[in-house]
Amino acid sequence: MLLASTTSASQLFVEMPEFYAWFRFRCDSYVRFWKAIHAAAHAARPGIDVRFNDCWIYPEMLGFDLKGMSPYFDSIRAADYVEETGDPELMVAKRGFYHAVRRAVGLDKHFVTALSQRVRATPALIKETILMSAQCGADGTTIASYDTATPALLRAVREGFAEAGIEVAAPARAG
């Protein structure tokens, strides 16, 4: 009704006020849910990082109002993994996704992205994801699916950070 049509969401809300009422209820319910989760988690363990893992390019279509929810999570991770499809045309939507997340949560919210190195990903798409993360205001990048990564994709991660001018800190040693 919406994604496959040229009709805008605004027009559907005008035509079907009950749809808007349901949608508003759903968004408000998720905000209340995250408020309760955040309060309970911080009461049980002060200093905990309550993170929202956003893997939907259009989270609002599911009723996730990131702007309304963001006071009730401490960080957000954007993980759509389109680079693992091997299709460079999907990267345009990925950039829009990252910008939308940063816009919704503001500049002060800790925001990390994710990249996947599954076999259809290419070194070029891995590098593009890393650069895009930096350009879109991410505070860091997480690496997923490294267990299935080829040596070329693992090298692309290292090279991507270097080419983007991002210094990767050595992991802290336990002890």
Region locations from a protein language model:
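Polysaccharide-binding and catalytic clefts of secreted carbohydrate-active enzymes
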Residues: M1-P88
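Surface-exposed amphipathic alpha-helices with a cationic face
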Residues: W34-P46, H99-K109, R158-F161
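Alpha-helical scaffolding within the catalytic cores
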Residues: C55-G68, P88-R103, A124-T129
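Substrate-binding cleft of secreted/luminal carbohydrate-active enzymes
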Residues: A79-L90, L107-A174
